[in-house]
Amino acid sequence: QYPWGFLYYRAYPQSIFLPFGRPYGRFLYSILRIDYIDWEGYAYVGLTAFAGTLFFLYILVSKFVQRKYRQITSITYNRQLNILFWASLASLLFSFGVPFILGLERLIDFIGPIRQMRGIARFAWPFFYIMNILTIYWLWNWWKSKDKNLIAASVTTVALFMICTDAYYNVRNKGKSLENIMPALTDQNNEDPDNQWLQRLDLDRYQAIIPLPYFHIGSENIWLDGQCDIINKTFISVKNSGLPTMGSLLSRTSLNQTIENVSAITAPSCKNYYLNRYPTEMPFLLLVARCEKKYPHEKELIRHANWIDSTGVFDIYELHPKAFKIIQDSLFSNVVREYSSVNLHKFRDIYTTYSIRNFQFLTFDSLLNDTSFFGSGCLSGKAKNRTILYTGPVPSDDTTRTYNLTFWMSNIRTDLYPRTMITINETDSLGNKVNTLNFPVSKQIMQVSGNKALIEYEFHLADNSNQLNISAQNRILRNNMIQFDNILLRPVTTDVYISDGSTIWKNNFCYCKTD
């Protein structure tokens, strides 16, 4: 598995040589567009190194024009600096993505462990140091060769002044950002009001902390960023309690372990890989932020936990591992009760809470496939192409403009697949594009079953009479196949039920009783 962002976090000539972020470079923002450059792609070398680069390139071109080919490699009279110059120049070109951006992206598959270096813009850093050293070295020798005349001295002084000026802007106001402004983090004795709950609990009774809203960042495939400042609160609690956490904010995390943790926190499915995976039967501590930004499955965890303490910003609950099974059985019983209701309306094998069919449900059983999820077929297509999940009108006869899209996707435990992008285009009766929505699968996982995941996304329409075109694409997977099944589009006010006897689907979520 390789980390994402090899070419995304690359440098550009303007992010290396132009003074963006400097007071004397503010005018550039009105001239050049730089919104496509990620912050990790910036490594401004400074005015001195920029001028030195132009000068040395001029020398190289002059020698080439004069056919002094043997002298081209000699920028200075110092052999070591000449070697460093060419090495730093090669490193700079690599930071730009050369040669891969020249239509040779396929070569990335053959560079071995170098591909593990996610942000290649960092390869511009050697150029920053070497070019500044080389420029000052050349000016110093020029000054000495001119018998220390005024012009050479002035140019060298200006170059040194600009290096110092750029160095100042590099560190200006950095001190404030490095100061620790979190008393709770440096509280050694847990005396801070936000930490006093740690003194009131026997922490040895618990195996880990589960933060809610849940967050998990770092697998390069799943991105659940949490809400309500839960990340800071969680890591302060981890540091002061000594307990591990099921939340993650790391640069590299096992994808399979990520899916295991995510599957435990999201809606329970029929294939519970997590019921017996915990090392002990000790309970968990739920760290629950006081906000409304929680998913229904997170609220279920809270409902089946016992409140034990609180602070000014969050509540603490105790959750026993057996609660995961209890929650699944409870949800199954509730769905069975709803499914058995006489108030539901039947449309072939589908039951809904609305009397008129105002949903679209696509099973793709006519597209026979040996690797289908449910039934006899599924939708599949090459990842690099746009696979159309749905095209047509929105479900009719509904007054709301808020809709819910769910679908199942395969290979969720395989590298790169969760990075698939979903695009929703809305067009009017004349074919004019009204709105476009994009979202990654990695942020919308709501249920995991084996190597499959249920993706859910809620969106608003400009007008119910408009047409929808929903597609999926993953260019980095190229010719690999991506597969989808059971695509459901419904108004948020309508519930849809399907059953095959032992399993019931409510709004595309899978429910069954545990053994």
Regions found by a protein language model. Give the residues of each.
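Periplasmic/ER-lumenal interhelical loops and adjacent helix-loop junctions
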Residues: 1-63, 465
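Membrane-helix boundary/interfacial segments in multi-pass membrane proteins
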Residues: 9-12, 31-41, 69-130, 181
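Transmembrane alpha-helices and membrane-interface helical segments
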Residues: 52-63, 85-88, 115-144
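Signature aromatic-anchored transmembrane alpha helix within multi-pass, membrane-resident enzymes
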Residues: 133, 139-168
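Extracytoplasmic
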Residues: 165-378, 383-386, 476-479, 489-492, ...
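Extra-cytoplasmic beta-strand recognition segments
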Residues: 244, 343, 347, 351-352, ...
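Secreted extracellular polysaccharide-interacting domains
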Residues: 379-398, 433-440
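Extracellular carbohydrate recognition and processing domains
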Residues: 431-467, 477
